[in-house]
């Protein structure tokens, strides 16, 4: 990255979103090194086909895609507040609009949040678990944006488009068929550079400096599934996420 950009001020912090101790350690290291944070882009994600649990006992799709950004962002909120104006950008997925594994047959089936089975313990379906975690990102974005109004921190979410990354390895496609699938899908996929454009826009555009609590697709505001706007469900999801990440609810009063 240093060679490609010519910018020597690039730092790397080890961080495993499937390990809450690793997230806490990364946040502590950041606070030790820096006193300001103006942009936080929560971009990492994974589609885990097998019903695996993290060392914390959390279903992997939920842990990496939702609880990871949730915990990291909460741990960095104090610094974001003191650095305002600041921006939080959360990368979601179009899977929130259609949680089916095969999307070109029949009607779309929007993702849903099941508070009684957030970890997909009753019946694990990889795409449904992934879509639920991505919907949780969007709902958490709306909830946090509303509570940070007036602080100088904006919070937005986005779908980057279908991007040519290694995430397809987690879609349950048999390994011998992966090369064929990759070649066949390449004409329909955006490059990683193009896929990053909306996140960069939300992180840097002066025109979006005051925009918050929005969901963007291909650089423009878009509607997310109707259930995502339910404030009671957002609050219940936030509380459940605090429990799963061992965050004290009282922390809200300290950081909001």
Predicted regions and their residues:
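Rossmann-fold NAD(P)H-dependent dehydrogenase/reductase core
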Residues: 1-171, 247-256
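C-terminal helical subdomain
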Residues: 23, 133, 157, 182-222, ...
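A generic structural signal for short coil/turn motifs at secondary-structure boundaries
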Residues: 50, 224-227
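Short glycine/proline- and charge-enriched loop/turn segments
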Residues: 115-122, 174-182, 219-222
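C-terminal amphipathic/interface module of NAD(P)-dependent oxidoreductases
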Residues: 226-256
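Terminal hydrophobic/aromatic helix or amphipathic segment near a protein terminus
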Residues: 162, 172-194, 251, 256
